[in-house]
Amino acid sequence: MLRAIQRATEYRARIAKDIKNAVRVHLIDTCGDSSPSSIQEYVDLLLENGKARYMWKTTDLESLTGTFEGLFLAPYIIAGISSHLEMTAGLPDELTVSTYPQGALALATVAAERALKGWVNGRDTIGEDLSNKKNEEFSETLWGTATKTVMTSIKKISAKKWQKILSAVTEAIPQVHSTPKLCKAASVDTEDARALAYEPNSD
């Protein structure tokens, strides 16, 4: 049980770390080497209450038509889904889920919000103040409500939209490995005694 909790914590931490890096790259690409005030202004727009601009590839302010485009296609959210796929690649069929990675998308979305909030002063402050470490954690306690809230939108995603999201992930990582770099998927020997072991129910 303890190991399962540890693995879940490591999974969340990896997604949060990869998204934090992707947010930094996105802000530098978008704002250039501009002053912290420019980054702060941009982050404020992305996180503006009632807008959730950070969830979109193109916001209402960037679009020529003044509309939002590309829900869940922001590059840092795609980076989070990429992390999920890399960590779960090569799992035995019995452990894989046939549906779309809704939970991973929810985690990626709120991890992006968390990472952007670290830039509200125009520079990344996450991890800077050790006395504030508990309030910066990417934990269920701090981010559970946000994760459940964003799931409401995720449950409405159509199969066609999921294909767009997964295509964007494939483009973001040049080669999506079918197995993790350090391991290969195991084959099954159905003639092995371990596979043939069986005991019928006794009276």
Which positions does each model-derived feature cover?
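Long, contiguous, well-structured interaction cores
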Residues: 57-203
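Helix-rich alpha-solenoid scaffolding regions
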Residues: 1-54
